[in-house]
Amino acid sequence: MARVTNSPASRKRRKKVLKYAKGYFGSKSKLYRYAKEAVQHAWQYAYDHRRKKKSDFRALWIVRVNAACRNAGISYSRFMEGLKAANIALDRKVLADLAVRDEAGFNVLVKQAQDALKTKAASAKKA
């Protein structure tokens, strides 16, 4: 009896892996053994970085809002505290967009945050 190798399926699987490894350097794109490992690592990195992208963007938004706050004469943490005290619920993504695209609108928010901080401090002194 002939040896059964399931050749069509094996060839298809190997070709698929080599297709995914197209563009990789050297033997990683030519040899199945190394291509399989490279593709698995690539997929793992892609999975991890899809999650890391969220924190990267959050950090970028914070940097942008902080820069705009410093230009307006307030620190980022005081600004965020003031927004919370003023019951302004805007996320960092929207704040960063405002800071970049609409400086006047952002300065209005800074003013509201500063006013809320003053009233918060005044009420804390009374108590």
Curated annotation (Swiss-Prot):
Claim: Ribonucleoprotein is one of the keywords in the record: yes
GO CC annotation, single: ribosome
Keyword Transmembrane helix attached: no
Keywords, alphabetical: Ribonucleoprotein, Ribosomal protein, RNA-binding, rRNA-binding
Matching PROSITE patterns: RIBOSOMAL_L20
Pfam families cross-referenced by the UniProt entry: Ribosomal_L20
One of the protein's GO biological processes: translation
GO molecular function: rRNA binding; structural constituent of ribosome
Family: Belongs to the bacterial ribosomal protein bL20 family.
Protein task: Binds directly to 23S ribosomal RNA and is necessary for the in vitro assembly process of the 50S ribosomal subunit. It is not involved in the protein synthesizing functions of that subunit.
Name recorded for this polypeptide: Large ribosomal subunit protein bL20
Species in which this protein is naturally found: Opitutus terrae (strain DSM 11246 / JCM 15787 / PB90-1)
